[in-house]
Amino acid sequence: MRSEMEKDILKVLVTEEELKARIQEMGDALYEKFEGKNPLFLSVLKGSFVFMADLVRACQLKSDVEFIAVSSYENATASSGRVKINHDIQQDITGRHLIIVEDILDSGNTLAFLKEYFMTKGAASITIVTLLDKPSRREKAITADLAGFVVPNEFVVGYGLDYCQQYRNVPYIGVLKPEVYAD
C-alpha cells in the first residue's frame, strides 16, 4: 500500500481484514438485540464516523442515525476531563433505544458524560459500542456494552482516529511513532 502516512506508523495493531470481520460480528450482535426496536445510532464525532458507517451497514436494522460533536481534549493527546457539547443531536430521544457509537473508550470521561446526559433526556435504553477499548487509561467507572478490540496504552490512529486531524483515513488501526506527537 502506498501512503505518505505509512512512515509515521510504528506498527499495525488491527488489520483491515480484522476490522471488517469484527465489525460484522458486532453488527450481528446489535441486530439480535435490537431487531424490531428501531434504535437510534449516535455517532460521536469526529472519530467514530468511519466505524459508524460500517457498523450500521453490518447490522441491517431499521434505525435512525444522529451525530454529536463533543470535546474533552485540551491538547492533541490528553483528555482535560471536562466535556463540552459542540453540536447536539436534533431528534427527541424520549423512549428511544440509543446506541452510542464511539471510536475509543479511553479515560471514559466523554462516554460517562454522554450516558448521563441522554438518560436525563429520556432514552429508553443506552447501549455503548466502541471500536477500541483502552482500559488501562480509564478514569471513570464505565464500560462498553460491546467493544471491538482491547488495545494497549499506545497512541493509536487510523479508521477514524486521528492525531491533529490527520491519519483518520488510514484503513487499519496503527500505533503512531512517538516522535510524531512528542513535544
Can you name each region flagged by the protein language model?
Residues 1-183:
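PRPP-associated nucleotide enzymes
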